[in-house]
């Protein structure tokens, strides 16, 4: 008999689940960008997250303390000392003078009114590691000669771990000093103190402290965790923060870049008093993408950037070294163009919380100006429009209007479910609600597809924000890990028929997939699922029958078959049986006894029963598994 090229694998599942088939001969491409992520400068993702910067409010943004004159996160030292916050500022902005923001550009002034008195400022709550070398920088100017003492101490100041002194001469110019300190002890609640005893007025423009071991100002351990989850696309700098971001400020030295105030500061920057301190610029973001193997996706500040400024950003990234902004890039050590292909024209325009036009027609009119200017610099861009999708009005009056040049339309959605874990009944109900809430993504994506198709234009869906709502304000759990697994299975399974090649999780760093403390970081249950499922990347997606619950995904790379399985049941095991001629090369189980917050998956070998033509396994409740099968055996 002629060999049948289309080999079928039967998967038989218990508990009434119908038999499934995996068709190895009928495969289709799997977009690598289904494994996309966001990196937005919000909440704890940068400050206290990816950034290696240890000092809070190091550029003294915002208002001073009541009757004290000291910037937030700092304390004054000395009894008869006069503290003021304001001009003259060392930090600055290059452009966007029309942006309505306040209190971004300050310096901290310390007037010591009594000669011989110790005056200065301190910050508490730092984590010091014995023997670790730290790089510190000060930007100051003074009215009289000053000996500035920088001390690393315990919280009270009684125990001193390291000291460095600087001799500062009076000048109207800013003095920039960099030095290194290595503490003689470890401390979870250390302080850094900047003091002097001379009667003088010392103005501090910026301060900095970070471990000397860093990756472009980022924590290497966090970068390693990000690499572990396998992002193939990273969207930056937002999200909502795209409406605050001044890309040209990134051309300034990092200490000189003005803080950036958020329009919706309580939501986006609640832990940093409404400000971002611009620790990561375009060059460092591109370096991060290259380190972790991701394509960059940039979002322009459509509300406050002019079309020309958006085009200049494109030229900075993609222009030849002899172009105006390509020359600037080359002067910063990056001769070759970055080749940034993906560009979002604003974020969530039309929802009301973003500044700029909030109507479909007004957005389309302004977006067209940015698009035309950007394409003059690079015709090969893939552009993304935004709006309150799915929305038929916006589809017709915005997405369709821009469709000749903008082929992708952004879709954002956050699932929500009650979370109560204090008794067995509420724990089970919450688990079921969380793990089933991924179906809202199915409904939204299908509605979006119908809405875009109704315009008659060929438009792709970019589902570039998704997660559980407010996941960034609470600890993760195995329940959310199963939710992420089911969501990823849906996105992989339906990416082609919904024409949805781009999907970006929001967001991994300190807000879902990577848990970060001053001492270290680790993957959450969500991150563990991503690390497991990245095995599907670069494979071809196999067609699977009777897979309505998205329990199974299979991809093929030549003679290797990768299968991931999900048992989303709260309290029932699930059996999978494969009629398959092959050898199991790898079988891993991610399981846990707990599903409540603070729970993680444990990794163990998956028990597999193999005969000549059959492979079977049983997954315990709320678990995920990976099998790799050698089809050439």
Language model features: what each stretch is:
Residues 606-633:
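C-terminal beta-strand-rich structural cap/linker in extracellular carbohydrate-active enzymes
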Residues 211-231, 285, 306-342, 367-376, ...:
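An active-site-proximal structural segment forming one wall of the substrate-binding cleft
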Residues 20-278, 295, 311, 361, ...:
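Extracellular and organelle-lumenal recognition/adhesion modules and their flexible linkers in secreted
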Residues 208-216, 263-278, 298-304, 346-364, ...:
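The substrate-binding groove and active-site-proximal loops of carbohydrate-active enzymes
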Residues 324-358, 413-415, 459-467:
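Active-site groove signature of glycoside hydrolases
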Residues 190-194, 359-481:
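Noncatalytic carbohydrate-binding groove/subsite architecture in carbohydrate-active enzymes
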Residues 41-42, 460-552:
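Aromatic/acidic polysaccharide-binding cleft in carbohydrate-active enzymes
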Residues 548-582, 591, 622-628:
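Carbohydrate-binding surface patches
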């Amino acid at each position: 008999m002629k060999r049948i090229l289309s080999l079928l694998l039967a998967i038989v599942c218990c508990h009434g689940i119908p038999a499934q088939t995996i068709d190895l001969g009928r495969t289709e491409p799997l977009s690598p960008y289904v494994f996309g992520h966001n990196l937005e400068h919000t909440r704890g993702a940068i400050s206290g997250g990816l950034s290696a910067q240890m000092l809070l409010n190091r550029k003294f943004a915002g208002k001073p303390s009541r009757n004290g004159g000291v910037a937030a996160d700092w304390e004054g030292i000395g009894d008869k000392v006069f503290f003021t916050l304001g001009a003259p500022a060392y930090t600055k902005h290059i452009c966007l003078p029309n942006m309505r923001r306040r209190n971004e550009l300050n310096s901290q002034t310390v007037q010591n009114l009594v000669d011989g008195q110790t005056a200065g400022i301190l910050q508490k709550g730092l984590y010091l590691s014995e023997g670790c070398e730290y790089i510190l920088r000060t930007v100051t100017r003074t009215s009289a000669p000053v000996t500035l003492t920088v001390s690393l101490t315990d919280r009270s100041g009684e125990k001193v771990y390291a000291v460095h002194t600087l001799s500062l001469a009076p000048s109207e110019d800013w003095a920039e000093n960099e030095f290194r300190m290595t503490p003689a002890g470890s401390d979870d609640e250390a302080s850094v103190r900047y003091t002097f005893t001379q009667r003088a007025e010392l103005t501090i423009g910026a301060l900095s402290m970070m471990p000397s071991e860093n990756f472009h100002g980022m924590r290497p351990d966090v970068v390693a965790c990000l690499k572990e989850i396998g992002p193939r696309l990273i969207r930056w700098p937002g999200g909502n923060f795209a409406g605050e971001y001044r890309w040209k400020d990134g051309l300034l030295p990092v200490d000189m870049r003005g803080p950036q105030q958020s329009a919706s500061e309580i939501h986006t920057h609640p832990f940093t008093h409404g400000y971002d301190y611009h620790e990561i610029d375009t060059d460092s973001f591109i370096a991060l993408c290259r380190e972790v193997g991701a394509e960059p996706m940039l979002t322009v500040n459509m509300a406050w950037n002019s079309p020309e400024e958006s085009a200049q950003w494109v030229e900075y990234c993609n222009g030849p070294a002899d172009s105006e902004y390509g020359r600037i890039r080359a002067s910063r050590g990056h001769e070759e163009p970055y080749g940034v292909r993906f560009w979002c024209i604003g974020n969530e325009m039309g929802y009301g919380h973003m500044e700029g036009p909030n109507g479909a027609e007004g957005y389309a009119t302004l977006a067209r100006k940015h698009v035309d200017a950007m394409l003059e610099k690079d015709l090969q861009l893939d552009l993304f429009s935004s709006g309150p999708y799915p929305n038929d009005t916006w589809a017709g009056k915005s997405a369709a209007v821009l469709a000749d040049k903008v082929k992708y339309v952004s879709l954002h959605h956050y699932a929500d479910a009650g979370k109560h874990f204090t008794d067995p009944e509420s724990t089970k109900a919450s688990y079921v609600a969380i793990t089933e809430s991924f179906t809202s993504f199915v409904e939204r994506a299908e509605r979006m597809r119908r809405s875009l198709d109704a315009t008659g234009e060929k438009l792709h869906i970019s589902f570039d924000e998704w997660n559980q709502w407010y996941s960034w304000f609470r600890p993760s759990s195995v329940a959310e890990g199963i939710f992420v697994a089911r969501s990823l299975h849906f996105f992989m399974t339906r990416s082609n028929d919904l024409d949805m090649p781009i999907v970006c999780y929001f967001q991994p760093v300190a807000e879902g997939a990577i848990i970060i403390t001053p001492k270290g970081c680790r993957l959450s249950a969500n991150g563990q699922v991503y690390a497991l499922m990245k095995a599907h990347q670069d494979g071809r997606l196999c067609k699977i029958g009777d897979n309505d619950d998205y329990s199974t995904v299979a991809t093929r790379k030549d003679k290797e078959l990768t299968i991931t399985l999900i048992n989303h049941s709260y309290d029932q095991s699930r059996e999978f049986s494969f009629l398959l001629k092959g050898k199991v090369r790898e079988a891993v189980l991610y399981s846990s006894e707990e599903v409540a917050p603070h729970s993680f998956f444990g990794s163990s070998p998956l028990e597999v029963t193999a005969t000549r033509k059959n492979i079977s396994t049983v997954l315990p409740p709320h678990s995920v598994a990976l099998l790799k099968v050698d089809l050439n055996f």
